[in-house]
Amino acid sequence: MLDLRLLRENPEATQARLDRRHSSYDIQPLLSLDQQVRQWEQERTQLQARSNEIGRSVGQKMREGADPQSEEIAALREEGNQLKQQIADLEQQERQVRSELDTYLLTLPNLPDETVPLGSSEDENREIHRWGDDRIREGEFAPHWEIGERLGLFDFERSTRIAQSRFVTLLGAGAALERALIAFMLDRQTAAGYTEVAPPYLINSASLTASGQLPKFSEESFRCDRDDLWLTPTAEVPLTSLYRDEILSADQLPLRYCAYTPCFRREAGSYGRDTRGLIRLHQFNKVELYQFVHPDHSEAAHQQLLANAEAILQALELPYRTIELCTGDLGFSAQKTYDIEVWLPSAGRYREISSCSNCGDFQARRANIRFKEAGQKGTRFVHTLNGSGLAVGRTMAAVLENYQQPDGSVRVPEALQPYLRQTVIGQP
């Protein structure tokens, strides 16, 4: 959530930064609502002051022996009653407009960091670096879904019977490979200083609002209407709310967490895209990285989180590239984002496998997560950062494609062999 005071005091500069996203966000309706609320607050304060003055005057006159039935006392009491009604009416109007103001504020995205490259689409994202170019092989490569079905690792047809399209059932070595990847990722991140968390998979609307999924992305998530619970679209959501409505001490920061969860998404806007394989499913597994940090250390934490995600691909010896998203491609809650894209040889291109974002104080304002410096007055909002470390299904797809052998088998990456207890999956 944006700082209302910033919007109020620097409307032109704030609008200009929003416009860098190349989206039609307009802060003027919000400023009009804010002005109306503040005007009513001022009127209510004046009416309350007059009401208090009347109360004191009546009390004083009664102590001086005035007749309670006198016209003067009756007139003062009548004015006091009218003022109370006016105040009540103003409070009701103010509550309604303040609710509209808060709702509008929740629809505005984060402001891009000044260092983010200007651009309107993913075509203007900037490549930062590549790793593993020497491991990219030439030739014809089978796509991962053909490899998996041939080796009996997963079954899409029966999954459609069980659920619907865009679901998968993992079998045998396929299920074992996914379990190995999850354990490997969690072990690597806990060794890097993250605390493992196993959060609820069902989350309430307040948690989705705090992280920025609601109200904008309500159509992207699966909801249990009877209980106001949603299937989590990412562990970022419950991790954001770990400290919702809490005040931390500065010496607690940074707080770094990793969590494995299944993730559930409707993928409503992706009709016809990636209809085969593990790239775009309604249910998929992911290991998420999350940090609560001091604002002064936010950028350094972002670089650290990115390195932690990249380290998984390096350990698996999977070629990848890292790009910085331009302003027009930023996610709703992010002020700066790096995407990591892994090489898929069957397609001859890189595909996103992780998105590492610095959200500044945007999510912390929505979740009301603050911290206090020792010996200082007041509190400040923490900064939050999140990233995939990594998307498990896409990592499996990359392993199957990059490690496929001429005889039809798949060599197990050396880093996974202690987890999978085999060096090769499948035989010709």
From Swiss-Prot:
Q: Does the keyword Translocase apply?
A: no
PROSITE patterns the record matches:
AA_TRNA_LIGASE_II
Its EC top class is ligase
> What Gene Ontology molecular-function terms does this entry list?
ATP binding; serine-tRNA ligase activity
Sorted alphabetically, which InterPro entries does this protein's record hold?
aa-tRNA-synt_IIb, aa-tRNA-synth_II, aa-tRNA-synth_II/BPL/LPL, Ser-tRNA-ligase_type_1, Ser-tRNA-synth_1_N, SerRS_1_N_sf, SerRS_core, tRNA-bd_arm
Where is this protein chiefly located?
cytoplasm
Where does this protein act, in terms of pathway?
Aminoacyl-tRNA biosynthesis; selenocysteinyl-tRNA(Sec) biosynthesis; L-seryl-tRNA(Sec) from L-serine and tRNA(Sec): step 1/1
Give UniProt keywords alphabetically. Aminoacyl-tRNA synthetase, ATP-binding, Cytoplasm, Ligase, Nucleotide-binding, Protein biosynthesis
Per its UniProt record, what Pfam families does this chain match?
Seryl_tRNA_N, tRNA-synt_2b
Subcellular localization is given as: Cytoplasm
| Quaternary context | Homodimer. The tRNA molecule binds across the dimer.
Mind telling me which HAMAP family this protein's record contains? Ser_tRNA_synth_type1 (MF_00176)
The UniProt entry's sequence similarity note says: Belongs to the class-II aminoacyl-tRNA synthetase family. Type-1 seryl-tRNA synthetase subfamily.
Q: What does this protein do?
A: Catalyzes the attachment of serine to tRNA(Ser). Is also able to aminoacylate tRNA(Sec) with serine, to form the misacylated tRNA L-seryl-tRNA(Sec), which will be further converted into selenocysteinyl-tRNA(Sec).
This protein is called what? Answer: Serine--tRNA ligase
What species was this sequence derived from?
A: Synechococcus elongatus (strain ATCC 33912 / PCC 7942 / FACHB-805) (Anacystis nidulans R2)
User: Gene behind this chain?
Assistant: serS
